[in-house]
A protein has these predicted regions:
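Conserved AMP-binding/adenylation subdomain of ANL enzymes
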Residues: 1-18, 25-90
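Generic hydrophobic-segment detector
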Residues: 20, 28, 32, 97-98, ...
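Short, low-complexity intrinsically disordered segments
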Residues: 20-23, 134
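Gly/Ser/Thr-rich phosphate-binding loop
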Residues: 41-44, 61-62, 69-74, 83-149
Length: 149
């Protein structure tokens, strides 16, 4: 999969990836895709003790303020919750988009309102939205079988 990512996402070779990740390590999304992407490209992975659930999302927001990356790989619920916070917090919005190259979601559909809000905020903060992509994968075999953007 890392060869596929390198072919489809040349951004990864352009500069070392930096990612904040809460996803469970026993799952192919975090354990195979994200972790191996960081290793293959000499990047930095920051482990997030929060996640998109009540009582833990504030931890994710604090970590994001400190370690926003050039990659944001997550599930749609995370991005929906993040959009609500960024609508109220311009500093958080600036931190999230400041260095962001790629926004990736998987695990479910990203609703149109969240997609539109992320594009709009990206334009407001950097003049254009980051590359927004998704992937169809197979948990049993590999994290990605098809990538679309």
């Amino acid at each position: 999969n890392q060869a596929q990512y390198a072919t489809v996402l040349p951004h990864l070779a352009a500069r070392p990836p930096k990612m904040l990740d809460w996803l469970p390590w026993n799952h192919v999304f975090a354990g195979n895709s994200n972790f191996n992407m960081i290793l293959a490209n000499g990047g930095s992975l920051y482990l997030d003790g929060g996640k998109p659930v009540k009582g833990l999302f504030d931890t994710s927001l604090a970590n994001l303020r400190e370690h926003a990356g050039n990659l944001a790989f997550n599930v749609p619920l995370y991005f929906a919750m993040l959009v609500r916070e960024m609508e109220r917090d311009a500093d958080l919005r600036r931190a999230f988009f400041a260095d962001l190259d790629i926004l990736f979601y998987a695990g479910a559909s990203l609703d149109a309102a969240t997609w539109a809000a992320l594009e709009r905020m990206g334009r407001e903060e950097r003049g254009e939205p980051p590359m927004m992509i998704s992937s169809w994968g197979m948990t049993e075999t590999a994290p990605s079988a098809l990538i679309v953007h």
